[in-house]
């Protein structure tokens, strides 16, 4: 199950937690190409030469309509798919084609978000001491972290860490990891980049594998970056959030509910119908462990940066915890405008939260 990270907005009038890591800047980026979810079933079945599967197409249309996703940004275009027809069939050996695209494009999309975060941070790029790069899109050596180091012109001595194949739990896991790095390395300024492109999951429909239709409906492409450090310098750095504590929990006997496997046909996707219920039934135990040390037990009194794995998950958790509609609004908005961005999703929601907070202050 996904990890949780407790995050607190920095407020000069509130009690300070000395020595905790601070989120100093956020940047996000998406491909310029985007698809309208309402018309995507027509495009998908046409580009995969599957228009004769009328019942399957109508089923996919119902899935898209229920997703509460309005649009998604995708690197995949009609031209790219026509050039690489092996991406459009369900079981074609296409891993080489997918890898060639991802190895090139994932670092580039990550660079766009990183440059925005660095610009907001306002400090010289030479002050970045650590780089953590995360993606579920493609595997290569030297990795995307190395490629991004070159693209940005980072110091050759920057301390790098590459995280592959962490899926949807990676966003909160990155917050936990970067908190430890920033707090245990004096003067560290950590650049975190999550860059996701869904080419590995795209393929034509299968009459035997319904999970494939959910994958084609749900995921979008995007990258997010943040700068994190401890003890921000007054007048030079502006903290946005404070990372107070983090925790991670495995729910027993759930490893079969959500599985992705890298095969010759790309990354296959299996999601049990039980996932929304399992998450809803176990989320409160995680919250109690995370917030009890701070005397917090009212889940409507805190702000939420909740990874929206899908609309059903958001609905079930909201209902189970008795949350007001505004608590998960940022998560719903990001899901609607971008789809499920896997590792980048939580950072997109953090960005949405800080924009909302700034707007409310005005």
Curated annotation (Swiss-Prot):
The UniProt entry, under InterPro entries, shows:
Chalcone/stilbene_synt_C (IPR012328), Chalcone/stilbene_synt_N (IPR001099), Chalcone/stilbene_synthase_AS (IPR018088), Polyketide_synthase_type-III (IPR011141), Thiolase-like (IPR016039)
Enzyme active site:
168
- One GO-annotated biological process of the protein: flavonoid biosynthetic process
Which pathway does the database say it acts in?
Secondary metabolite biosynthesis; flavonoid biosynthesis
Pfam families named in the record: Chal_sti_synt_C, Chal_sti_synt_N
Q: Which reaction does it catalyse?
A: (E)-4-coumaroyl-CoA + 3 malonyl-CoA + 3 H(+) = 2',4,4',6'-tetrahydroxychalcone + 3 CO2 + 4 CoA
UniProt keyword annotation of Transferase present = yes
Q: Which GO terms describe its molecular function?
A: naringenin-chalcone synthase activity
Instruction: Locate the coiled-coil region(s) and give their ranges.
Output: none
Homology family:
Belongs to the thiolase-like superfamily. Chalcone/stilbene synthases family.
For this entry, the protein name equals Chalcone synthase A
UniProt organism field: Ipomoea trifida (Morning glory)
């Amino acid at each position: 199950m996904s990890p949780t990270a407790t995050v607190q907005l920095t407020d000069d009038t509130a009690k300070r937690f000395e020595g905790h890591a601070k989120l100093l800047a956020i940047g996000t980026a998406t491909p310029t190409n985007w698809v309208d979810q309402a018309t995507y079933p027509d495009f998908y079945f046409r580009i995969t030469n599957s228009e004769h599967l009328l019942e399957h197409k109508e089923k996919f249309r119902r899935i898209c309509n229920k997703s509460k996703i309005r649009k998604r940004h995708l690197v995949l275009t009609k031209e790219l798919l026509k050039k690489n027809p092996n991406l459009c069939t369900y079981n074609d050996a296409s891993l080489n084609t997918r890898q060639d695209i991802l190895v090139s494009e994932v670092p580039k999309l990550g660079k766009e978000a990183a440059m925005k975060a660095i610009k907001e941070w306002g400090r010289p790029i030479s002050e970045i001491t650590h780089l953590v790069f995360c993606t579920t899109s493609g595997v290569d050596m030297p990795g995307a972290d190395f490629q991004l180091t070159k693209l940005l012109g980072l110091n050759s001595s920057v301390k790098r860490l590459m995280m592959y194949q962490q899926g949807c739990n990676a966003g909160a896991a990155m917050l936990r990891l970067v908190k430890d790095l920033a707090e245990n390395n004096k003067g560290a300024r950590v650049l975190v980049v999550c860059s996701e492109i869904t080419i590995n999951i795209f393929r034509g429909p299968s009459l035997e594998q319904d999970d494939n239709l959910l994958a084609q409906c749900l995921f979008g492409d995007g990258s997010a970056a943040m700068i994190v450090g401890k003890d921000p310098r007054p007048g030079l750095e502006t903290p946005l959030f404070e990372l107070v504590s983090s925790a991670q929990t495995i729910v027993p006997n759930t490893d079969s509910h959500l599985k992705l496997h890298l095969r010759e046909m790309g990354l296959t996707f299996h999601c049990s119908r039980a996932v929304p219920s399992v998450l809803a039934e176990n989320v409160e135990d995680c919250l109690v462990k995370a917030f009890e040390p701070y005397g917090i037990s009212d889940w409507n009194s805190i702000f939420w940066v909740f990874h929206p794995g899908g609309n059903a998950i958001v609905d079930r958790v909201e209902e189970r915890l008795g949350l007001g509609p505004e608590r998960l609004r940022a998560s719903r908005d990001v899901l609607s405008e971008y789809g499920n961005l896997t590792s980048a999703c939580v950072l997109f929601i953090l960005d949405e939260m800080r924009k909302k907070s700034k707007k409310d202050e005005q």
